[in-house]
């Protein structure tokens, strides 16, 4: 593993037998930690460029994978477009996985796309968005009327930029793209562990319409397969990732109750319940994010959050299998919690 820019610039003209080079954002995150080993196992033997503000933290999260000769941890800030462009050029990056969030997500993401264009080495992008149809037809039909959460709405804008505002791959600075649209992470439930075990209360207001759930490992697999595809089959497509079945707050509390053998009650998604949720979340994150999350859950209550049968089948094609079971996640999680208590 190397640190910094100890590599010569590589030409963007690659032969078919040249191993690809992928720049992976958020490599220490829920998706990234699962994605890195998948990419290292691919027959194409890609080189992985992992930018980070904290190399020591990232290396500790990667465990033994951080010592692989094809892993290059680069110290720098992905919010700096100059750093990004230099990194893409220096390492001859051929494809990127962009997984970004934050209050400045729009500017950082657009700057990222611009750096890719200027570098002229990147030929494919896998962009992490969110589950849902964010196309023009849906917008004209009124989809945005209930979307008030900034971290969700920004993805509509970014998807529109990709669909209607980037240079074609065949042109200088152009690249193809695949959008991954995950539903609500299984792992979100782990934030409610203390509330579930000590208070018998599932504190996430998922609403009465139902939301799809997704294993971050499935998102990582979809991303790995989309990077490997390099725009041959999945270019210009958005693939939803998650369960076809949706789960209400009551459904979720009932599942946890069944496995734990004790009654778990569900958070309400009416005005009073969402006010209480925001108050709780303000103790965990800043006030901007607390309100933004409340607005997202309000959308879930009004509209639900899921995918069609056709979208689900497209996912199965990309994954090469059905997505993971939410019920099985709960079973495994409770077993682990019980083992932790007994040790």
Label every PLM stretch briefly:
Residues 3-5, 13-47, 51-61, 79-81, ...:
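Oxidoreductase cofactor-interface core, primarily capturing Rossmann-like NAD(P)-dependent enzymes
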Residues 36-39, 46-55, 82-84, 241, ...:
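"… SH3/SAM/PH, and C2H2 zinc fingers" -> "… SH3/SAM/PH, FHA domains, and C2H2 zinc fingers"
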Residues 50-120, 132-141:
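NAD(P)H-binding glycine-rich loop region in Rossmannoid oxidoreductase-like domains
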Residues 85, 110-113, 216-224, 326-331:
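Short, amphipathic alpha-helical "lid/cap" segments that border enzyme active or binding sites
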Residues 126-128:
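Short beta-strand segments at enzyme active-site cores
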Residues 247-248, 311, 325:
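Residues that mark the N-terminal boundary/hinge immediately upstream of a DNA-recognition element
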Residues 253-306, 342-343:
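Terminal hydrophobic/aromatic helix or amphipathic segment near a protein terminus
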Residues 314-343:
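Amphipathic terminal alpha-helices
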